[in-house]
């Protein structure tokens, strides 16, 4: 195992310390329990957005804390769910009286712990569950579909509504709508190594890929031989289109996400290949995002997310955002 680390026990804490020091104008990092908030207090009357999950998926979620997105994020240990006390401490810190919206990826530990935190909270709260992965219905981590890269889009779009004064119920409704109008699927060319484990999560041959892989290395639909990029892209996107059923001339947001170990050169190539398929079906790409946002440590691979847009979703996607990982309009 080759990683920049001192000890596995200190890996997360040192990473959080570095993140906080590098972005102290945007975030504040708290310890025991670990959570991240904006550096400035939540505005009175603003719905507070909180998300979280296992570390190793950076910049999701800590890198998405800031103006126009999250108010707080709860990082668990690598690929392990955060605990209810983290979520409760974060909620108590950022709740300004308008309520708290938890954005939760559909993994059993995340769902259970966020539900426990919600039950312990004194004030009003709601949850949005993301389950955009069309690859499999059930996995070792979930009952039902997994929550993956569309979570980033939910956090951006709902974050905009919350910033503009949307109510708790309005924010939940928009989050549910974005999730329902999004589909994702990924492929891995390599595994990844959790620091505490010291060995790859799974094994892949030099000429193999895991098609439909999860963000923790969960098995996908099948293991196959590497193919040309256009063939891989077409299969990922066709599975999403079959699930979403966009109409001809529908406007969409196309998000090509890196898993952590794939260079941007290749991600833009995938975007080009995806555009060719969507153009052939008269599905319009009116918004786009390319980069490493929902990663799996050093895994080589990529995922594609397609989101059907309406005027409300597009407006909140375009609005100002300033986080460590995403910034425009400021």
Question: Can you describe what each PLM-predicted range is?
Answer:
Residues 128-170, 174-181:
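Short alpha-helices
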Residues 1-49, 311-330:
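N-terminal amphipathic/basic leader segments beginning at the initiator methionine
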Residues 57, 64-96, 241:
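Glycine-rich oxoanion-binding loops at beta->alpha junctions
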Residues 111-124, 130, 266-272:
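Short Gly/Thr/Asp-enriched flexible loops that form oxyanion-binding sites at enzyme active sites
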Residues 44-52, 61-74, 136-138, 209-225:
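Gly-rich Lys/Arg/Thr-decorated short loops/hinges at beta-loop-alpha junctions or inter-strand turns
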Residues 239, 244-330:
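C-terminal non-catalytic interaction/assembly regions of soluble proteins
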Residues 164-269:
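Mixed-charge interfacial surface used for oligomerization/domain docking
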Residues 73-78, 121-144, 280-285, 289:
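Short, acidic/small-residue loops that bind anionic groups at enzyme active sites
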């Amino acid at each position: 195992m080759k990683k920049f680390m001192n000890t596995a026990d200190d890996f997360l804490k040192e990473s959080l310390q570095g993140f906080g020091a590098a972005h102290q104008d945007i975030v504040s990092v708290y310890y025991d329990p670990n959570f991240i908030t904006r550096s400035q207090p939540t505005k009175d009357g603003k719905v507070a957005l909180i998300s979280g999950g296992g570390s190793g998926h950076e910049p999701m979620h800590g890198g998405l804390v800031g103006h126009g997105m999250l108010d707080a994020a709860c990082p668990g240990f690598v690929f392990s769910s955060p605990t209810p006390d983290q979520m409760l401490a974060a909620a108590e810190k950022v709740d300004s009286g308008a309520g708290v919206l938890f954005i939760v990826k559909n993994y059993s530990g995340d769902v259970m712990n966020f539900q426990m935190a919600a039950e312990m909270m004194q004030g009003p709260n709601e949850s949005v569950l993301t389950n955009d992965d069309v690859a499999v219905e059930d996995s070792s981590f979930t009952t039902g579909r997994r929550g993956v890269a569309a979570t980033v889009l939910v956090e951006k779009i709902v974050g905009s509504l919350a910033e503009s004064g949307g109510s708790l119920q309005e924010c939940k409704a928009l989050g549910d709508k974005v999730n329902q109008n999004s589909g994702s699927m990924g492929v891995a060319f390599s595994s990844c190594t959790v620091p505490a484990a010291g060995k790859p999560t799974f094994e892949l041959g030099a000429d193999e890929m895991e098609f439909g892989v999860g963000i923790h290395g969960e098995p996908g639909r099948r293991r196959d031989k590497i193919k040309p990029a256009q063939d891989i892209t077409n299969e990922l996107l066709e599975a999403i289109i079959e699930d979403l059923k966009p109409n001809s001339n529908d406007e969409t947001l196309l998000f090509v996400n890196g898993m952590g170990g794939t260079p941007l050169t290749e991600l833009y190539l995938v975007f080009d290949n995806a555009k060719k398929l969507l153009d052939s079906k008269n599905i319009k790409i009116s918004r786009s995002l390319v980069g490493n946002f929902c990663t799996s440590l050093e895994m080589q691979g990529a995922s594609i997310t397609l989101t059907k847009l309406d005027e409300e979703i597009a407006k909140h996607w375009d609005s100002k955002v300033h986080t460590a990982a995403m910034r425009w309009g400021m």
